[in-house]
């Protein structure tokens, strides 16, 4: 296959109709930068939401559920699907000429060498999800009492799923695959779909309610899909379901992968906002079955941190790990890391607020890149690669470059609703002086 010369980062989520028209021969592969805080950024989470469509592809092509059982052709079909689904460019298919068992045995570091930056992260994330799902599928002893259709999900979900605001479920009819992309039914961007992920991958100490019984963490149930219209779909809609006459299991009704589309928003108005940053959980407890305890109460990130520890003057006001746990973004993302540095007084020599709202300056961009590389275990990270991730934020209305000022950027998403801080409050806490440099 002819390698693409244009490596400009691109990422798009195709609708189901576009997916049907997909031809492997028309496909080229690609380079995808960090995901964003509109719903979060780098590999975080609705990987399940977008990757769920691979279940249909597995059914169509007869690809085994367990990736360790894949042949060389299965591996190629999987990579081809991902390339088409995300409009990736820059992937060398020859590097993936191996069996599924060999692919899974590579380990993360070796696997990431097979694809360009960020593309490898996406593929690895999906491969891990597929392996976990196959284990759950093999160990489950629950047999559905209803006939499964061709597109009935093989996935499982746990009580550990984040809660979502729901509307009353429709009555169950024949299992049906939702043919419209989630993106076509809601004003949600592609990176929001990609930013959801397993709770099993989150820092357990940050996400689990200490009062929640451990026994609930390991309970899994099969998903029963229902016919859902756009009018009654919601983000990661959860409801009570029945399986073989047994009540009180949780099912996702809009899409088998919506178990990660449960990111909530700090206010109802933010549903209609183009600059949205999700809060971790802003829904009422009555939206959930009484058997499922909530992870935490409502509140901003400020409340979330205050409930867990007193602020230490020698530590960042906004630790990236805590912010990742609060938003449910999984791995720490670039925007979260930048906020950590910006709220750490010891880092003001190389990155700091300018004193003008959410604007900040990289006084030493190489040092920022070095620290980001150290945090992500990528020793080859440099400012050129870091800036590629920042540029990806421009079109997403997450971060903008300030015109006429070198290395100066501004958060343009709604950080105030997410964090619970106004910029002036953070500036005062950090003794920020207005930047007089032109």
From Swiss-Prot:
Q: Which GO terms describe its cellular component?
A: cytoplasm; nucleus
- The organism's superkingdom is given as Eukaryota
Briefly describe activity regulation.
Autoinhibited by a module composed of four alpha helices (HI-1, HI-2, H4, and H5) that flank the DNA-binding ETS domain, reducing the affinity for DNA.
Write out the GO biological process terms: cell differentiation; positive regulation of DNA-templated transcription; positive regulation of endothelial cell migration; positive regulation of erythrocyte differentiation; regulation of angiogenesis; regulation of transcription by RNA polymerase II
Q: Which UniProt keywords apply?
A: Cytoplasm, DNA-binding, Nucleus, Phosphoprotein, Transcription, Transcription regulation
Main subcellular location of this protein, as a coarse class: nucleus
- Where does the protein end up? Nucleus; Cytoplasm
Summarize which parts of the chain are annotated to bind DNA, as ranges: 332-412
Q: Report residue spans for region: Activation domain.
A: 128-240
- Which segments carry the region annotation Helix H4? 415-419
Residue ranges for the region (Helix HI-1) are 301-309
CDD domains in alphabetical order: SAM_PNT-ETS-1
- Cite a single GO MF annotation: sequence-specific DNA binding
What residue spans carry the region label Helix H5? 423-429
Q: Which Pfam families does this chain map to?
A: Ets, Ets1_N_flank, SAM_PNT
Domain named PNT: residues: 49-134
* Residue ranges of the region described as Helix HI-2: 320-327
Subunit info?
Binds DNA as a homodimer; homodimerization is required for transcription activation.
To which protein family does this belong? Belongs to the ETS family.
Write out the function statement from the record.
Transcription factor. Directly controls the expression of cytokine and chemokine genes in a wide variety of different cellular contexts.
Q: What is this protein called?
A: Protein c-ets-1-A
Q: Which organism is it from?
A: Xenopus laevis
Gene name?
A: ets1-a
């Amino acid at each position: 296959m002819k390698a693409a010369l244009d490596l400009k980062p691109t990422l798009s989520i195709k609708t189901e109709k576009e997916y049907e028209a997909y031809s492997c021969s028309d496909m080229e592969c690609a380079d995808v930068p960090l995901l964003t805080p509109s719903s979060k950024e780098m590999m975080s989470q609705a990987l399940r939401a977008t990757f769920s469509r691979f279940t249909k592809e597995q059914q169509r092509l007869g690809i085994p559920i367990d990736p360790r059982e894949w042949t060389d052709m299965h591996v190629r079909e999987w990579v081809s699907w991902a390339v088409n689904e995300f409009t990736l460019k820059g992937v060398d298919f020859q590097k993936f000429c191996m069996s599924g068992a060999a692919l899974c045995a590579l380990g993360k570091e070796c696997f990431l060498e097979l694809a360009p930056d960020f593309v490898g992260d996406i593929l690895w994330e999906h491969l891990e999800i597929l392996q976990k799902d196959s284990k759950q599928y093999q160990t489950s002893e629950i047999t559905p009492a209803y006939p499964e259709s061709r597109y009935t999900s093989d996935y499982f979900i746990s009580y550990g799923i984040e809660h979502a605001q729901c509307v009353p479920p429709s009555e169950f009819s024949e299992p049906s695959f939702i043919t419209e992309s989630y993106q076509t039914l809601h004003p949600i961007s592609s990176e929001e779909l990609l930013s959801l992920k397993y709770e099993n991958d989150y820092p357990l100490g940050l996400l689990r309610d200490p009062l929640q019984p451990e026994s609930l963490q390991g309970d899994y149930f099969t998903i029963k899909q229902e016919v859902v219209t756009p009018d009654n779909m919601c983000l990661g809609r959860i409801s009570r379901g029945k399986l073989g006459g047994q009540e009180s299991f949780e099912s996702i009704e809009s899409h088998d992968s919506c178990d990660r589309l449960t990111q909530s928003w700090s206010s109802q108005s933010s549903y209609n906002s183009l600059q949205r940053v999700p809060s971790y959980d802003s829904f009422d407890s009555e939206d959930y079955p009484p058997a499922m305890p909530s992870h935490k109460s409502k509140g901003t990130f400020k409340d979330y941190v205050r409930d867990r520890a007193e602020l230490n003057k020698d530590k960042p006001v906004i630790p990236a790990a805590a912010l990742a746990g609060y938003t449910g973004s999984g791995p720490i993302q670039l925007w979260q890391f930048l906020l950590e540095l910006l709220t750490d007084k010891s880092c003001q020599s190389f990155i700091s607020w300018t004193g003008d709202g959410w604007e900040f300056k990289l006084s030493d961009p190489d040092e920022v890149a070095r620290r980001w590389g150290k945090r992500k275990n990528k020793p080859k990270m440099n400012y050129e690669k870091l800036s590629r991730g920042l540029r990806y934020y421009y079109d997403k209305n997450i971060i903008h470059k300030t015109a006429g000022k070198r290395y100066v950027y501004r958060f343009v998403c709604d950080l105030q609703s997410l964090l619970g801080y106004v910029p002036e409050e953070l500036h005062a806490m950090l003794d920020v002086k207005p930047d007089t440099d032109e």
